[in-house]
């Protein structure tokens, strides 16, 4: 063969002997051959060239992929510039990792079968000249083809933490290396250890090959079975062009176009590095879009999606320009300085890779700030609602007396640098407003605002822990408000916003409280304890209601009151708590330490008659009284026979207050001032057998 021969990888393209080829843009010219079919057939020499090999790589770079497929630098540049449309196994070149934080290992099976070439002394003999032929833009003609087949098994892990990528990749590689020697049992199942099975279950498989399969493998076990079938599927009839030898057309037709020059290795390396760097940015963007936090914040999701589209458009335009420059250089119309200038212009544009990576760094920081806040906030178990219409519907619910809303105030889809990129795409000759994103445009680029946001998130969580009740509801949302940096805790009272920087409820002195909603900050839902209830008390309605007068047979339990008709609640309380009850008849309501005596008929067992209990009482005989340690005092009430009693315990302050409840208002009745030493239990005395009076209560 002549010394100026050109050797190129077939890349799934349908080469045949005698076919014409334009090396300036690496395009086949189908439908035309230099010689008649009969002449080609007579002049073809075929030789057997059987071989097979397998190789494993843990890289996803275009260099390593090209090396596996024997692609030289010039053809690689054409592929990167979008000049070459690949097919068959070569589609592997287009298969890129979706995420940067993802492990990938590729197994290649390669086989060759035979080599065909045209006789070197064919020369211009039998060349078909015509006017049509003179207009065909071909620089070379195919004179040799090596046949065979490639198969690529691409194994990908799920997205993982960045610190685990290498470790998981190593585990994958160790297992995949065993594929050629893995045994398949008589039941056609792959024999693996339990540890190997755990590893292989964690990754997927994608197949690119020159073999016809009824179904492509998607799992490790599928891949093993397919791999072991490939040698039997290989043969001359199933082989495809792998490598192609071409000679210049000027050897046969002096007026034919020529491949005048090609770009130097440093320039081709710059092509590769620039395009691969953009791919790396796109993978970072995919990583970010896959983050669960981003799925919550649609504004962030929109920015990342817009950035991804902009990068795709930039990549397409850059590839198209590279393709034009490569063709011009190879045609001799321009020298390689045209490509040099292209990349210099790119460096001086907003699309320089440093700026794109800087934007991604800013966006990743925003995501991390939002994620760190959400990690704190979710411990409060709030309703996370990013639709403002749905949020305000929740706030209008009559059950929501108090709404506390942690609001992200600076999360927006607007981004000045994205606007700059978009404008530059539309008008690349215009002077951009900026070449790179500026930290001052991003609130999260400084530490003080994110730190403040986390402090407010901790406050929000503590409020939720302290006021976990039916009347106070907690929400998380995002409402853009440039006047409030980072975040705020907005307070809504019965759907109306009261404060946008809430820290704690404002509680007046317990004796002066009039608005029932102020007490409902500390609403407490209680349940009566059946194990403590005296035998004559009947509990119902989910142990919320107790009525005296039953004639049940006694049941012995060490916690049960056996003399006084009393019952305690299940939950011991410290902190601040408010509860309400409906009451009628002979009733005492208050709190007691758990250690109150249960079995005697002495004051030690009677609510209010000892140091361990405090009660507010109503009897028909004595009226309203407050009682502690056996000392009682009458309490004047403006509405005799009122039906609803409110009780507010401020354990840290040492107060226990009682209120008459009338719809939205309360009237203070009495406050005990003491020092509590342990949790107290709401407790009730209901009826009196000796006085033959009954009573009932219902916890609200």
UniProtKB/Swiss-Prot annotation:
One example of a Gene Ontology biological process annotation: killing of cells of another organism
Function as written in the Swiss-Prot or TrEMBL entry: Has hemolytic and lethal activities. Its hemolytic activity is inhibited by anionic lipids, especially potently by cardiolipin.
Entry similarity comment: Belongs to the SNTX/VTX toxin family.
Quaternary structure and partners: Heterodimer of alpha and beta subunits.
Keyword tags: Cytolysis, Disulfide bond, Hemolysis, Secreted, Toxin
GO molecular function, one term: toxin activity
Cellular localisation: Secreted
PTM notes: Not glycosylated. Four intrachain disulfide linkages are present in the heterodimer. No interchain disulfide bound links the two subunits.
Tissues showing expression: Expressed by the venom gland.
Annotated GO CC locations: extracellular region
Chief location: secreted
Keyword set includes Ribosomal protein: no
Annotated protein name in UniProt: Neoverrucotoxin subunit beta
Domain B30.2/SPRY residues, every copy: 506-700
PANTHER family: AIG1-TYPE G DOMAIN-CONTAINING PROTEIN, SI:CH211-281L24.3
Annotated Pfam families: MACPF_SNTX (PF24674), PRY (PF13765), SPRY (PF00622), Stonustoxin_helical (PF21109), Thioredoxin_11 (PF18078)
UniProt superkingdom: Eukaryota
